[in-house]
C-alpha cells in the first residue's frame, strides 16, 4: 500500500471524520482510521460503533492499493502541523505506516483493517433525494425537543418518516413536541425510523456546507446519507414512536397573535426571577394584553405586560419559560400564533403564514 496526497486536502478530510474517534481500552481500533485505497479512490473511515463516517478522495498520482488502520488523532496532529500545500507520502512497510513530508518523517503503528468494524453491506428499503438546506432546517426546527437520557429510549432521538407525500421530522421528550414538514417531489416507499440524538447532532454539523443534493437510503436498522464525497451511516433506535398526531390540535380557534421580539424579551425578563428548579411562569391573556408573571423560592416577583392581537375569553396558564423560548428561537417570522386546547393542558405554537412547522408544549398545573 502506498499513496501520495496534498496535505491540505488530507487534513480537510480528516477533520470531517475524527470527531467520532473514541478511547476504548477493550476495543482500541476505535481510536484508528481505516485507510483504504482502490480504483483511484482513497477512503478514510471512522466509527464509534453507532455512527460511521467515510470520506472519499480521488487520487491523481500513482498508488499501490491496500488497506490498514492507524491512529486518527496522531495522523491529524502530524499533518495539521505540516506545510499546507506540501505533498505527504504514505507507504506501508512491514505493518508500519511511514509518513514523510519535506524534511519530516514519521513511523506509525498499525492495526489490521480486517478487525475494523464497518458497514460494508447496506440493503435499503427506501431511498430519496432532498436538498441539504431543507434537511438541515428540518433538524434545526425539531432537535431541541428530543429526550435526553430518557428511560423511554425511543424518545432519545428524532422520528423521520414519509407520510402523505411529505417528509416529517418529529421530536418529543414527553413534555413538548416539535414537528416539521417538507413536501417530497417524488413518491417513495413508506418508512418510519428513529435516528439517535447523537447521530442527529453529528448530521446537523455535517450539513453546515454549501447547499447540495443529498441521496438518502433507508435500511431496516440503519440510515445512510451521501453528502457529496462523505458517507454518513448510523444505526437506528428500535421501538415504536408515540402517536404524535393525536397531540396536534384538530381545531384551532381563538388565535393569540404576538410579536416574536416583544414576547421573547418579555419572557427573558420574567425568567430572571423564575423558580430555578421548576422554571415556571404565569401567563394571563385578555383583550389584546399579554401579561407574564414569575416568582421564585426567595419570594421575589416579576411582572411584564405588552400588547397582542386577541379578543377571546381571559386565559390564565402556567408554562416552562425555557420551553417557550426554545420555540421562539426557532421561529423566524415577525409574529407567532398560539392556540390553547379545550382541556387547557397544552398550547400549540406556529409561525405566522407558515404551517410546515408546529410546536406543542404541555402546560404546568397551577
UniProtKB/Swiss-Prot annotation:
InterPro entries, alphabetized: DNA_clamp_sf, DNA_polIII_beta, DNA_polIII_beta_C, DNA_polIII_beta_cen, DNA_polIII_beta_N
Keywords: Cytoplasm, DNA replication, DNA-binding, DNA-directed DNA polymerase, Nucleotidyltransferase, Transferase
Gene3D superfamilies in UniProt: 3.70.10.10, DNA Polymerase III, subunit A, domain 2 (3.10.150.10)
PANTHER family according to UniProt: BETA SLIDING CLAMP (PTHR30478:SF0), DNA POLYMERASE III SUBUNIT BETA (PTHR30478)
Protein name per Swiss-Prot or TrEMBL: Beta sliding clamp
GO biological process: DNA strand elongation involved in DNA replication
Principal place of residence: cytoplasm
Function: Confers DNA tethering and processivity to DNA polymerases and other proteins. Acts as a clamp, forming a ring around DNA (a reaction catalyzed by the clamp-loading complex) which diffuses in an ATP-independent manner freely and bidirectionally along dsDNA. Initially characterized for its ability to contact the catalytic subunit of DNA polymerase III (Pol III), a complex, multichain enzyme responsible for most of the replicative synthesis in bacteria; Pol III exhibits 3'-5' exonuclease proofreading activity.
Subunit and interaction comment: Forms a ring-shaped head-to-tail homodimer around DNA which binds and tethers DNA polymerases and other proteins to the DNA. The DNA replisome complex has a single clamp-loading complex (3 tau and 1 each of delta, delta', psi and chi subunits) which binds 3 Pol III cores (1 core on the leading strand and 2 on the lagging strand) each with a beta sliding clamp dimer. Additional proteins in the replisome are other copies of gamma, psi and chi, Ssb, DNA helicase and RNA primase.
Subcellular location: Cytoplasm
GO cellular component, one term: cytoplasm
GO molecular function: 3'-5' exonuclease activity; DNA binding; DNA-directed DNA polymerase activity
Organism whose genome encodes this protein: Buchnera aphidicola subsp. Rhopalosiphum padi
Amino acid at each position: 500500500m502506498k499513496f501520495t496526497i496534498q496535505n491540505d486536502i488530507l487534513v480537510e478530510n480528516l477533520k470531517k471524520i475524527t470527531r467520532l474517534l473514541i478511547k476504548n481500552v477493550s476495543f482500541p481500533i476505535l481510536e484508528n482510521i481505516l485507510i483504504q485505497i482502490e480504483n483511484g479512490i482513497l477512503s478514510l473511515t471512522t466509527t464509534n460503533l453507532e455512527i460511521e463516517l467515510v470520506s472519499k478522495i480521488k487520487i491523481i498520482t500513482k498508488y499501490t492499493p491496500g488497506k490498514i488502520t492507524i491512529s486518527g488523532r496522531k495522523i491529524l496532529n502530524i499533518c495539521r502541523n505540516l506545510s499546507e500545500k506540501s505533498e505527504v507520502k504514505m507507504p506501508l512497510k512491514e505493518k508500519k505506516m511511514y509518513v514523510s513530508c519535506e524534511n519530516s518523517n514519521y513511523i506509525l503503528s498499525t492495526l489490521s483493517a480486517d478487525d475494523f468494524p464497518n458497514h460494508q453491506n447496506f440493503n435499503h428499503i427506501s431511498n430519496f433525494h432532498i436538498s441539504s438546506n431543507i434537511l438541515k432546517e428540518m433538524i434545526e426546527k425539531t432537535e431541541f425537543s428530543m429526550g435526553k437520557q430518557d428511560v423511554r429510549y425511543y424518545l432519545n432521538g428524532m422520528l423521520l418518516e414519509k407520510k402523505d407525500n411529505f417528509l416529517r421530522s418529529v421530536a418529543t421528550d414527553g413534555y413538548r413536541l416539535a414537528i416539521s414538514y417538507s413536501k417530497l417531489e417524488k413518491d417513495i416507499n413508506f418508512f418510519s425510523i428513529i435516528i439517535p440524538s447523537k447521530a442527529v447532532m453529528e448530521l446537523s454539523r455535517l450539513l453546515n456546507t454549501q447547499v447540495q443534493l443529498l441521496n438518502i437510503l433507508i435500511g431496516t436498522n440503519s440510515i445512510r446519507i451521501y453528502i457529496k464525497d462523505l458517507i454518513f451511516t448510523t444505526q437506528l433506535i428500535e421501538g415504536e414512536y408515540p402517536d404524535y398526531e393525536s397531540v396536534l390540535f384538530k381545531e384551532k380557534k381563538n388565535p393569540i397573535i404576538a410579536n416574536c421580539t416583544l414576547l421573547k424579551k418579555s419572557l427573558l425578563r420574567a425568567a430572571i426571577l423564575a423558580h430555578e428548579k421548576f422554571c415556571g411562569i404565569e401567563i394571563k391573556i385578555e383583550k389584546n394584553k399579554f401579561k407574564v408573571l414569575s416568582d421564585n423560592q426567595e419570594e421575589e416577583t416579576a411582572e411584564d405586560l405588552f400588547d397582542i392581537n386577541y379578543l377571546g375569553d381571559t386565559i390564565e396558564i402556567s408554562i416552562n419559560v425555557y420551553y417557550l423560548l426554545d420555540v421562539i428561537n426557532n421561529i423566524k417570522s415577525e409574529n407567532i400564533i398560539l392556540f390553547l386546547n379545550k382541556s387547557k393542558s397544552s398550547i400549540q405554537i406556529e409561525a405566522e403564514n407558515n404551517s410546515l412547522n408546529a410546536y406543542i408544549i404541555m402546560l404546568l398545573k397551577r
